[in-house]
């Protein structure tokens, strides 16, 4: 997910995306623990997407307050 795509979304959409990514991250952790994880790079990708969404959400909320 690119930052440009994330910036075009509303706060509600960002919250929904964040929730779905956290669920995916949870499932990936379980797959890793049980040895069923095939796409190991996806763990890192999901973690970075979560960080991007949190960063942009914080920027948007700071812009609203200013």
Swiss-Prot record:
Instruction: Report the superkingdom from the record.
Output: Bacteria
Q: Name one Pfam family in it.
A: Ribosomal_L29
- From the Swiss-Prot or TrEMBL record, what is one GO molecular function term? structural constituent of ribosome
Q: One GO CC annotation, please?
A: cytosolic large ribosomal subunit
Entry keyword Cell inner membrane: no
UniProt keywords (A-Z) are: Ribonucleoprotein, Ribosomal protein
Q: Which GO terms describe its biological process?
A: translation
Query: Which PROSITE patterns does this UniProt record tie to the protein?
Result: RIBOSOMAL_L29
Q: Which NCBIfam families match?
A: L29 (TIGR00012)
Return the similarity comment: Belongs to the universal ribosomal protein uL29 family.
List the HAMAP family. Ribosomal_uL29
Q: What is this protein called?
A: Large ribosomal subunit protein uL29
**Gene source species:** Mesorhizobium japonicum (strain LMG 29417 / CECT 9101 / MAFF 303099) (Mesorhizobium loti (strain MAFF 303099))
Name the encoding gene, please: rpmC
């Amino acid at each position: 997910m690119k930052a440009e795509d994330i910036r075009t979304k509303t706060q509600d959409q960002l919250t929904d995306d964040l929730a779905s990514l956290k669920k995916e991250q949870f499932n990936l952790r379980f797959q890793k623990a049980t040895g069923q994880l095939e796409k190991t790079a996806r763990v890192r990708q999901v973690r970075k997407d979560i960080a991007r969404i949190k960063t942009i959400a914080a920027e948007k909320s700071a812009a609203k307050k200013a």
